Amino acid sequence: MSDKKALSLSDLDATKASAEAFEFEYLIDGEPSGIFFSVLGGQSEVVTREVAELINAKRRRDVARAVRAKSGKPADFDPIEEDIEFGQRLAAVRLVGWRGISDPFTPENALKLCQTNRDIAAKITEESDNIANFMKL
């Protein structure tokens, strides 16, 4: 039998743990860059709320499109650029700070960074989705 103490539901609250920023250094070819990002966890309320808002907006467009199609109006579609922007916005909302970048951190600059550097955006999302970065059991 293990000597580990039992965990409470509070100990397993990933939403609460994900609300505390996690800082990581961005590596370039495995080497330190001196650039550090602070991210919220993917299960945080802030990230979850933004994801819901983005998905709900897409669903509203889909419903409006279906209604137009039934009325005989020309159908349109969501271009791939909207899907790319969706992913960039999902990465940017997770980012709450940085060190080693001369520009000030703002939500607008976070989005700009995620729009102009896919590798950084992907790393932000990866670290944010890694629950081990936030849960300390």
Predicted regions, residues:
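Short, charged/polar N-terminal "headpieces" of proteins
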Residues: 1-63, 134-137
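Generic structural signal of hydrophobic/aromatic residues within well-ordered alpha-helices
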Residues: 12, 47-55, 86-87, 91, ...
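Solvent-exposed, flexible loop/coil residues
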Residues: 13-16, 94, 102-105
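Polar low-complexity intrinsically disordered regions enriched in Ser/Thr and small residues
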Residues: 33, 44-45, 75, 100-103
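Negatively charged, Asp/Glu-rich surface segments that serve as flexible interaction/assembly modules
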Residues: 51-96
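C-terminal charged interaction modules
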Residues: 97-137
